């Protein structure tokens, strides 16, 4: 596979290999048959990051080969959205002869949406001044004149200049309902929008007719919490990153959802609060005992759940676990399967043509 050519003819083979691998990994837990959710074969990534290589008067996007660290020129990137692919050559064309914009530019990050918005972050090894800002504003305006719904950001050491805003608003139709999700550059968002919708709809289907409330750890910008809110009386969600919490609060308001409460704290801290080991000022005014959480939702980082959180999670009748690393999922399941059964298993092909697998399990406590 090269950055400019995807092995589309091998998509089915690579997906089948993942299904086999996940089935084998999960066999120890008596898991049901894998529900498989495919990706589009191209233009599936909504974000992309490139280094910028300067060669005389020319400059262009590059990536590095993960094995050899060889530099690879990238003029088109079919894994990324069509919007990113349209913008890449136009951006390079416009900054090639603009010394203020190209001088010590070393990276460009793109974050696009299905709704047609895009934010571009330009990273520099130099101080950004008023002159840069004026040149960047002219660049933004000329790209907007070409029809791009675009926002530009300049970054340098300890500097971030937003010409307008540092976010885009994504619009996704989830099980017949349009959801708006504010996504801030440089914070976590699901990269494959179409597969993200499939994940949300699977989570909705897995929690239909739920009793009580939902607790979610690692909620990010509210991606899952807001979609799942319709299945529960109330949702209590935790997140540690400030920009994600701010986005989640905005998303609650813009989607007119009134039964979701976001708390800014780490999952480990929340475990301590739930166990009565520590009190936190951030929890003032929130009576945790009022929540009747029958279901807990976790979408942890690649490292999985720590031992204390695993113990806390085990107290809930139903556990919905989304994992970006089946290896640590299986490590967690070694403990969780002593009290719970795996009743659903899903593979979401977020990252086609790579070894990465995103999967989901629903665990139900044994009686």
UniProtKB/Swiss-Prot annotation:
Q: Where exactly are the transmembrane stretches of this chain?
A: none
- MF term (GO), any: rRNA binding
**Could you tell me the EC number(s) of this protein?**
2.1.1.-, 2.1.1.35
Q: Does the keyword Nucleus apply?
A: no
Reaction(s) catalyzed by this protein?
uridine(54) in tRNA + S-adenosyl-L-methionine = 5-methyluridine(54) in tRNA + S-adenosyl-L-homocysteine + H(+); uridine(341) in tmRNA + S-adenosyl-L-methionine = 5-methyluridine(341) in tmRNA + S-adenosyl-L-homocysteine + H(+)
Gene3D superfamilies tied to this protein: 2.40.50.1070, Vaccinia Virus protein VP39
Q: What keywords is this UniProt entry annotated with?
A: Methyltransferase, S-adenosyl-L-methionine, Transferase, tRNA processing
Active-site residues are 324, 358
Report residues binding S-adenosyl-L-methionine.
190, 218, 223, 239, 299
Q: Does the keyword Transferase apply?
A: yes
One GO CC annotation: cytosol
User: Which Gene Ontology terms describe the biological processes this protein takes part in?
Assistant: tRNA methylation
Q: Give one Pfam hit by family name.
A: tRNA_U5-meth_tr
Q: Which family does it belong to?
A: Belongs to the class I-like SAM-binding methyltransferase superfamily. RNA M5U methyltransferase family. TrmA subfamily.
NCBIfam families given in the database record: trmA_only
* Function statement: Dual-specificity methyltransferase that catalyzes the formation of 5-methyluridine at position 54 (m5U54) in all tRNAs, and that of position 341 (m5U341) in tmRNA (transfer-mRNA).
* Full protein name: tRNA/tmRNA (uracil-C(5))-methyltransferase
Which organism does this record belong to? Erwinia tasmaniensis (strain DSM 17950 / CFBP 7177 / CIP 109463 / NCPPB 4357 / Et1/99)
